[in-house]
């Protein structure tokens, strides 16, 4: 037997320790680069990239019919991915799950698993096709935009990376465990990512704080609520962080007990396992107060119902559930990805800049490809044009040639053409010798020369290149405009979230059933007087909008209820929605008691002692209290006003105290006897206005009456007081419907009726009276006008926002409304047809408003 250790042996001796190290390192790099970690540019692991590319080549696209998943898996493992079919199918399934992917890359048909942990059906039963978004990952791949590499056996080629018009790594996130390292990148909102990228294009040196004005944080496909910004900021700054996510819940009231309903779960939480976990904790008496847990989820969404015992407090039970179950989880962020064949942890800004760099590279390569193609075509057309310009000579030359080669050589020699041009001339059909075909060739050549010039300019100009990226990003956003799902709330030990929230003007609406939302006021474009408006909210069949107002996101909202309680809430904590969104139940935002109803909502920026809060009730009562008495925030609220039986709040106004105003410190004065004037309306028709010093309160009634009296005649009283009479009604069925504060008699008061009839009137036309009088006519009411709805002070910097009973909002320039006298009706302000105006408010003007129509060009004058 030959000695294997002899010098003549072909066997090479190696050190086993070094061999193991080398082999393990090779294996590690293979797993890291070729399997477990995503590429930082397109956000895909090799298996995901190969699945999409195989579907693209196999024509299993979203514009075609579904194909069997087994066909896709077979194409992937046969052509690109030399691994087991199970691994490929599992990856395909996850790409189609809307609870795993924020924006699924594949549309599945059949059983693709569930949030309860159910497995997908076998690949022979399910079908799949590319989603519309995945086309954006592969667009322009046929234009030499990315490098191709040989597949595992060298028989075909596959893309090293996809062109990816979307920032897919941040969009859908990624998770994976490699050798000695792992990645866990959360998904994000497409709209926010694009807004951040557009800002970064305009501001190359933008800071993280600036970018986070647009990219608020992760947006998980299962929704939930993120508590705290510190973990998000740390993850975005360093690439590592921890994000606390809770289930989204609401409380429903039943007879003598509460019900906790889970609407959304933390990302990657198994719903069935969660229900089992809660049941086990109740059985072991680790959580008290729960009588039943059941799953009422359906195709509309998640609904896990937790019924409580009568004596149980929902807040305590809910806190225990968060503490003891997966209703609260922590998402550990590790933004690790492959770049230049090496793993690296990225910050948010680095990933955004890397995506923009990738897109620049793709667009440059695409432009070069299109330029070469255009130049090649122009070259051919130039040859054809030369031939057409010398058609008789060309025909004679070809006829006198013995063969094609001779003809080609003769054309090249005679006209200075290239071989390509000569071949194109020889291949040209006789039909192209017509005048029409000649014109087509000339037009095509002219267009090509313009296109060549455009493409050359792109390659020369960084600005044009970035403009192309901007246009593509805006196009993507318009195609896939999906609002954020996951809410982000402040944490008890968090930084001041207001530093990260822009102070924007919002329209806040609340419905009869207590659904509240905020919408940027810019979404309601100003319309011409008499316009029909835009739908402000979609309500349930038995619901309608009760009130709306405008406020800034940093303002504090004071909610006053029918029980006289006052609660607080920051505007930015109200979920932002679209114009037609239903909103969120207000009971999830403030601690209302059972059957308690909100009657007034007042926005304020501070609780200055120089300000007062004036309440007006339906029965004509006015009450004034120093605003500072409402600043001590408690979760159970504070007492705001005592109401008489059958009375309710109409409005509440914050008023700045007059500088020379002096208040009595003793008991309640009999202000009824401190009269200035108390003249009947009939005697005021020919009277001159009476001027006064200081602010005045102006209240109006449903039947068109009004009263103006000095603010100083309503002194400040305590929080729990009742108030005093503002106006006495002439008619039994009359009631107070609105009130404003007048600074001086030069101001204009805008009044509007239920049928959209309105006018502007100088405040001086309304005589000053004593508080508690019967008032004077504010608006002349008829069958065409119906009842008076309310009044506002005209402000040239503000627009009027009117709300109808069907939920439409219309924005009107107050200056476009005609001025009219006190005892008149006015003109059509809002065209309500069979609808009615139910509320009005003021909001800031927008710069790009439409021009208003003049009174001479529009409408009905009801003077």
UniProtKB/Swiss-Prot annotation:
The active site is formed by 125 (o-(5'-phospho-dna)-tyrosine intermediate)
The UniProt keywords, alphabetically, are: Antibiotic resistance, ATP-binding, Cytoplasm, DNA-binding, Isomerase, Nucleotide-binding, Topoisomerase
> What's an example of a GO molecular-function annotation for this chain?
ATP binding
Q: Any idea where the Topo IIA-type catalytic domain is?
A: 37-500
Please give the SMART domains that the UniProt record associates with this protein: TOP4c (SM00434)
Localization, per the record, is:
Cytoplasm
Q: Which GO terms describe its cellular component?
A: chromosome; cytoplasm; DNA topoisomerase type II (double strand cut, ATP-hydrolyzing) complex
Q: Which InterPro entries match?
A: GyrA (IPR005743), GyrA/parC_rep (IPR006691), Gyrase/topoIV_suA_C (IPR035516), Topo_IIA-like_dom_sf (IPR013760), Topo_IIA_A/C_ab (IPR013758), Topo_IIA_A_a_sf (IPR013757), Topo_IIA_dom_A (IPR002205), Type_II_DNA_Topoisomerases (IPR050220)
Question: Coordinates of motif GyrA-box in the sequence?
Answer: 527-533
In the record, biological process GO terms are:
DNA topological change; DNA-templated DNA replication; response to antibiotic
Q: What does this protein do?
A: A type II topoisomerase that negatively supercoils closed circular double-stranded (ds) DNA in an ATP-dependent manner to modulate DNA topology and maintain chromosomes in an underwound state. Negative supercoiling favors strand separation, and DNA replication, transcription, recombination and repair, all of which involve strand separation. Also able to catalyze the interconversion of other topological isomers of dsDNA rings, including catenanes and knotted rings. Type II topoisomerases break and join 2 DNA strands simultaneously in an ATP-dependent manner.
Q: Which HAMAP family match?
A: GyrA (MF_01897)
Name of the protein = DNA gyrase subunit A
Q: Which organism is it from?
A: Campylobacter jejuni subsp. jejuni serotype O:2 (strain ATCC 700819 / NCTC 11168)
Query: What is the gene name?
Result: gyrA
